[in-house]
Amino acid sequence: MKFLEDKNPVIVSNRGPVEFFRKDGKIVMKRGAGGLVSTLLPVVEKFSGVWVSSAMTPEDAEVAAGYPENRVPLPEDDPRFTVSFVIVDRERYESYYSVISNPLLWFIQHYMWNTPYFPEIDDKIYLAWDEGYVHVNRKFADKVISEIERNEKNPLIMLQDYHLYLCPGFIKKKVGDVFLSQFIHIPWPQRDYFRILPEKMRESIINGLLSNTVLGFHIKRYCSNFMECCGDLGYDLDSENGVVLNGDEKTFVRNYPISVDPDSIRRTAKSDAFREKEDFVRKLKGDMFLIYRTDRADLSKNIIRGFRAYELFLKEHPEFHGKVKFLATGKPTRQQIREYRDYTDAVKGTVDEINSKYGNSSWKPIEYIHRADYELVAAAFKNYDCLIVNPIADGMNIVPKEAALMNEKSGTVILSENAGCYEELAEYVIGVNPFDIKETADAIYKALAMKSDERKRLSDGLKSKVRERTIYHWVNEQFDDFERLMK
């Protein structure tokens, strides 16, 4: 990281590395979870950088208001970096986040719209675009520009994800010659599906993203899809070298597969909370096979088809009744959006239906725990015999990677061919079409009936494959490209 010594790293994301909330009448701080924070925050801390993010809670805004320009130095007792909060009125934020970012963009990028009926891109959507998405992206850009102007070091701007597609264009227009990069953590759709968006929105998004010098995706397929969308709008392509030409400017389109932090996973497995949850999982499993899945209650995760596949497995293989337990954990997400509330209810209804149909006084086929509990997830990772990860589409999905490193039962993974990680892991998983319930039911039987030596071969191969790339490879490969292109 020597090249960072004269740089001012500025990370830009909708959700930041910390969140403030009220507990027992006092405002307290919670560090954000996930690989993005654990990987990039040490960089920001080491080089006294800045993280620009939305004020997600009233307490975020309250704390930010106590500092000039809403720039909060952290940690409070020994500041090593700054969180620079973007504060937007609630109505505009909801238009930006809960109308345009999700569901409109999220559903397009995960192929989830029921196109004979939805989306209906009417005057309300256009208003949410103009007054919400465009407005908030301008606010983020203004904040980043302020950070660039206040620091004499060369700025290194790293924007994150689909909430901020327009932001780099606004920055470039004001600042001019500045190095911008952006990583998109979700899939990029094929060009025909991207055309669901009106041309005005498509052009604005592509123009914004092409203001970056480096644009990152998880896998090569998403890079190709993006470049084809650029070609549709008349941009010149150097497909062999992964470059989109925009006049005199070049955008280098690269794939950087994200991974996991093995050290963090090992630490989790040593905690008292983990041991307590492992006792629960082992009692739940008893001498049965344990099938496991964990998801946010997001429509893209394809939870209901996973349960329907299990239902078909039980129908076709009654010899497994009473000998298998399906544990599913997950947390509610985006419940302010009607489609998500309806889906959460449908998931619970499906579980109740299957348990009523096949269960009895001594056996409950599915145990569904609808809350966030990482120690419980980790305990299930360690003890599953079969893991199901069957998203309709997913940028990467690190669940199979985390689970493989923790599992001690030579567990087998059933993995959707539409998960980004399938490109890396295909050799050591049972791949399925996420829409094919029959194929997934057969995969469950194959996983549970598999001979122990084959289970071990797949499990050991998967562990080895995951260890080849940690989350630090993801960030270091980006820095290597930045260093080369900034010279």
Question: Which residues does each predicted region cover?
Answer:
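Catalytic cores of carbohydrate-active enzymes across secretory and cytosolic contexts
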Residues: M1-K487
